[in-house]
């Protein structure tokens, strides 16, 4: 199997059998799963054509306030745009539909700082209540006016980032078309007319979107919109890149801290790290998370986002702008390549790996190796490695919160070292993490694990 680079196509549509829709989420044994399905890069091959007698697989993505049970989430492209770099004026929106939509700042979000150093890239970002995907390309030209390079991005906005990846291949083709034939927008206009969505006023139409919920069925439907086609997969790349430190990121993600990931361009693969980081915090137990902010993937951010980030209490984002490192009031955790750090004294203990963390990482790799062996020997690719990754942390999180809820419902509400070990935590090394977790989620228990540093 030939190994591919990070820029290889990652995601394509995953079709599956029908999933029955429950009448009441309370009737589901597993409860609801607060999900983070990510966008992704569409594979270059043409999509499989469905035969006439073959039923279309139903969507199972639900968003409270927008869709009813059993509804299908339709395409809702609310804007399409072309951004160009002008040597005299800088980044600017060259063309868009509809013409009256507010695209302020999109010219910087869709063309990341430092993009002139790469030939192509793709960028996920957030614009108010919408999510965006833009494909960037840089083409050498023999033009003194353009200083030897023509740079453009073609992108779209949608209320849901889980739908954006469907149009990756189209956007890649269109940005090349715009570079070679500037000013020809007929294909983009036809695309918008075909895909434009009608948005209705209602809950979640303000400055932030409602949380995304998934039907708790077979494991693969925790992200029904995606299927990894890359030989390594974005989850595998995430594990390989961060190694044992994914357990540090897991704790910060579960605590809903503000996590900012820095990396120079290309930024597309870093947007996937944002998504993977959000996947670490999935919980499917009812009653969990009502008092804590949702895990928000902001994807790419730049200096134009500083004002909006100042009011956020929880997010995961990435940037190519090093100046963010100096603005400590904007983040709790700063990730520079594989270096995870925090300036908050009370969070410093969470940066240290303990024996329980290493054991979890060992088990994760052991399960991955067993899965890969099964795939190679038996040819069984269901479940895939990405299913395993999501389920591993989902089950770990459920085990922790199930124990905490049981202790909080008991008469003495006492959480002991034995409870901590049963949750897969280190009684001493994870004491600070447990205290922060109890406070963040408002769980009423008494922690009686002694602190060895304090007599």
UniProtKB/Swiss-Prot annotation:
Pfam families in alphabetical order: DENND11 (PF09804)
dDENN domain ranges (all copies): 364-455
Superkingdom classification of source: Eukaryota
Expression induction: By transient cerebral ischemia.
CC terms in the record's Gene Ontology section: cytoplasm
Keyword Transcription recorded: no
Region (Disordered): 21-61
Modified residues (N-acetylvaline): 2
Keywords: Acetylation, Guanine-nucleotide releasing factor, Methylation
Positions with biased composition (Gly residues): 32-41
GO molecular function, one term: guanyl-nucleotide exchange factor activity
Tissue expression from the record: Expressed within the somatodendritic compartment of neurons, is also present on dendritic growth cones, but is not found in astrocytes.
The uDENN domain, residue ranges: 15-187
Function: Probable guanine nucleotide exchange factor (GEF). May promote the exchange of GDP to GTP, converting inactive GDP-bound small GTPases into their active GTP-bound form. May play a role in neuritogenesis, as well as in neuronal recovery and/or restructuring in the hippocampus following transient cerebral ischemia.
Record protein name field: DENN domain-containing protein 11
Species per Swiss-Prot/TrEMBL record: Rattus norvegicus
Gene: Dennd11
